[in-house]
Amino acid sequence: MSSDNSKQDKQIEKTAAQKISKFGSFVAGGLAACIAVTVTNPIELIKIRMQLQGEMSASAAKVYKNPIQGMAVIFKNEGIKGLQKGLNAAYIYQIGLNGSRLGFYEPIRSSLNQLFFPDQEPHKVQSVGVNVFSGAASGIIGAVIGSPLFLVKTRLQSYSEFIKIGEQTHYTGVWNGLVTIFKTEGVKGLFRGIDAAILRTGAGSSVQLPIYNTAKNILVKNDLMKDGPALHLTASTISGLGVAVVMNPWDVILTRIYNQKGDLYKGPIDCLVKTVRIEGVTALYKGFAAQVFRIAPHTIMCLTFMEQTMKLVYSIESRVLGHN
């Protein structure tokens, strides 16, 4: 009995630490994501180039064979700076995307739980349907906000003076990329591939936090682990693998749509059909090793740091706004 009460107290304490404003949630989520992307940006870079190589060709030579070999090739030709291409765009994008995806998930979930389960405490309800919808909804918000930045980031990271993969577009930086796209392609150009971005991010977000929270609850309820960094690490690892499997096909599609400037693809479904028809179904999992190599540590760091940034922001809000 005392063991059950102890578990309940821990859950209540944890929930209280994350009971912050929507703006605070956005800030905490964005901050956690920026810390993570600093480490994982080089892996994102090689993932993009692996996804683009062999585009619309089943027999093209593979310059980048795996993430480690690929990063070694980039380092040899472009140096450390080359491995961190697009980092500034990645920071701004992460604030928009993950600030929304990580920050708005709990407020949306809580509101829906209050609506559908009025007789229960919202933070104690674990409805798969509500969790998945909340994850997808918060992800879609982030995808819309961050789409122009992801577009510029993709083009910055795919460009290389040494090994040309896919369509090459040279921008001097984030602002130059945004201005150039606006001048040449208009507002529509800035939101090129927004439908693919929504599919990609919605798919990944629909499983990221639901898997994370479900894994934590199962591990704690069955006395397999106690709440703390080890639990957060384990649950986020499981979540990262789930995200990689679900998101990779749409990630390939989005990368290709973002990188092309013409009308090679009419939309995400057209790109999906052409990719499978010409390169085979396995093309949808191009760069999967890099995806796992990136998304697993990125998710681990994002979700683990989010636990801490949520508590940090909550403590600041408590002092400034007088939260209980």
Curated annotation (Swiss-Prot):
Chief location category: mitochondrion
Localization annotation: Mitochondrion inner membrane
Key words of the record: Membrane, Mitochondrion, Mitochondrion inner membrane, Repeat, Transmembrane, Transmembrane helix, Transport
Reactions mediated catalytically: a dicarboxylate(in) + sulfate(out) = a dicarboxylate(out) + sulfate(in); (2S)-2-isopropylmalate(in) + sulfate(out) = (2S)-2-isopropylmalate(out) + sulfate(in); (2R,3S)-3-isopropylmalate(in) + sulfate(out) = (2R,3S)-3-isopropylmalate(out) + sulfate(in); malonate(in) + sulfate(out) = malonate(out) + sulfate(in)
Gene3D superfamilies (alphabetical): Mitochondrial carrier domain
Family: Belongs to the mitochondrial carrier (TC 2.A.29) family.
Misc. remarks from the entry: Present with 5350 molecules/cell in log phase SD medium.
Protein name: Mitochondrial oxaloacetate transport protein
Taxonomic source organism: Saccharomyces cerevisiae (strain ATCC 204508 / S288c) (Baker's yeast)
Gene behind the chain: OAC1
